[in-house]
């Protein structure tokens, strides 16, 4: 039946597959730039790298308008409640990219008393981008991994922290 309809020019899919495809192609990121990794993240939106090719070029100013939070840099204990508050203001479905060694696990400041040893202790992280600071290409790879995760996994199975 599907081959017959495909030959006639029809496309068979489920509504879930269509929604996953649409969400993966139109990510609206919000920056949570805390340190030097934010400079590399800003570079991604420039004309040399053109993040808009992946449907994620325009950074949103409000958490209510975005569905991807990119945490870039060192997260301090005083900033952790603000990060969680901004995350809670985002509409479902929402995703988090942890960018850089400091956001992933504390990085260079891992043993400092005022540093959170990874933003995954505050918000659930979907993709980790390694590096100090990670290059623009590494962030692109992380965004592509997030797109694949959105497209091929059920997004409502995740339990938030």
Curated annotation (Swiss-Prot):
Entry note: cofactor: Binds 1 [4Fe-4S] cluster.
Cofactor(s) needed: [4Fe-4S] cluster
Membrane association type: Peripheral membrane protein
PROSITE patterns xref list: COMPLEX1_20K (PS01150)
One cellular-component annotation, GO: respiratory chain complex I
Quaternary assembly: NDH-1 is composed of 14 different subunits. Subunits NuoB, C, D, E, F, and G constitute the peripheral sector of the complex.
Identification of the protein by name: NADH-quinone oxidoreductase subunit B
Name of the coding gene: nuoB
């Amino acid at each position: 039946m599907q081959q017959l309809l495909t030959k006639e020019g029809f496309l068979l899919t489920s509504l879930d597959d269509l929604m996953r495809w649409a969400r993966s192609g139109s990510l609206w990121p919000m920056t949570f730039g805390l340190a030097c990794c934010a400079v590399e993240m800003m570079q991604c939106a420039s004309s040399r790298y053109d993040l808009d090719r992946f449907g994620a070029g325009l950074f949103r100013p409000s958490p209510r308008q975005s569905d991807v939070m990119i945490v870039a840099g060192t997260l301090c204990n005083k900033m952790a409640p603000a990060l969680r508050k901004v995350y809670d203001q985002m509409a479902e479905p929402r995703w988090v990219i942890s960018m850089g060694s400091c956001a992933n696990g504390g990085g260079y400041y891992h043993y400092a008393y005022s540093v959170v040893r990874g933003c995954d202790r505050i918000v659930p992280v979907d993709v980790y981008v390694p590096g100090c600071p990670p290059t623009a290409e590494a962030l692109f790879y992380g965004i592509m991994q997030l797109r694949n995760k959105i497209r091929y996994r059920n997004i409502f199975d995740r339990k938030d922290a």
